[in-house]
Amino acid sequence: MVASSFAVLRASRLCQWGWKSWTQLSGPPPLSTGGRTTFARTNATLSLEPGSRSCWDEPLSITVRGLAPEQPVTLRAALRDEKGALFRAHARYRADAGGELDLARAPALGGSFTGLEPMGLIWAMEPERPLWRLVKRDVQKPYVVELEVLDGHEPDGGQRLAQAVHERHFMAPGVRRVPVRDGRVRATLFLPPEPGPFPEIIDLFGVGGGLLEYRASLLAGKGFAVMALAYYNYDDLPKTMETMRIEYFEEAVNYLRGHPEVKGPGIGLLGISKGGELGLAMASFLKGITAAVVINGSVAAVGNTVCYKDETIPPVSLLRDKVKMTKDGLLDVVEALQSPLVDKKSFIPVERSDTTFLFLVGQDDHNWKSEFYAREASKRLQAHGKEKPQIICYPEAGHYIEPPYFPLCSAGMHLLVGANITFGGEPKPHSVAQLDAWQQLQTFFHKQLSGKS
């Protein structure tokens, strides 16, 4: 299907490159000028499948037809986030002998990426504003992606041959979004479109607080009831996280277990970064946590005290002399936390847990030593006769392992540090990690919460 919505294009505020018709640009065949072949306008069309909309974690089929045989072209893609920040990518290609370009078969010859990367125009996007992370704030509205085909291999100089817009949604058709204000609990519950009951998951993000819903909303389209849970800096919750009381998270667990559309009896936890650390603490202190996925989490309390009833876990010490400066002027804090093997009181008591764990680890995580933490958690669990957790490590993947096709955020502001730090990762291997991790965590939760293989 050829995407063709000028109304959406105008609304996206992305169209900065003119308004000539892109659906069918006609002209003479290639001309020979002094031994150099040039390509004039063609009847090029840019086709996307699915056509005008898809979910963010779905792959796109991108095809250009009506080009001249072996015509060199540049494809570029752009989107704006809710704050107006521009993200874009481009790649150079060559049409086949029939004048067709299929990104599933044609390798990129250069640009933001190279090689056979059908989704490279999405995952390789970079922010125009330095150190800016793509974060979806409103899952009820899509990202609008503009794609263009330009003649030649100059990303800003070639004549536009075709253009399309495509909506990337974060809620599959029929997914239900239910705001939750129950006691102290502040959250949003996402339910699949079909009748329940459903296996249930609590989803936790990291430092920065607020309520991020995009991972929960996408997972609800996979058959899970997912509660995106805020725990600070949101609504009437505490503005800081000096003390994390697990009783708050216990309230959230009890709310979800009592919901009429959840299957029970056990709950799944999904947490990244600080959310992974809190997931480990919840699994250690609370009953009914059947399965937990920890994405680049810490096995020690970091930056704040963790409390449950009369127990207190102090944060690990900071080693300020271990902070380094990169050649790009960023702080590297990967060595800046004392080992929980030294600060033993800061080690979260995972040995108390009866939870089945999956650790997803970026081996180039520079936020902290995620692989070390996962392996130390595994050692402690096994030393106490508990089930050996699964650990999946991703070479050259950084800290923020997101749902598929999110661009890598390799550096940015760390609110606890108060400065820009490196988060690690390389774009291509990080994108591979995100795609695999997304499938791994779904398979894990389906098996542990529903008994599906």
Curated annotation (Swiss-Prot):
One of its GO terms (biological process) is response to hormone. Optimum pH is 8-9. Pathway: Lipid metabolism; fatty acid metabolism. Its main location: mitochondrion. Disulfide bonds: none annotated. Pfam families: BAAT_C, Bile_Hydr_Trans. This is Acyl-coenzyme A thioesterase 2, mitochondrial. It comes from Rattus norvegicus.
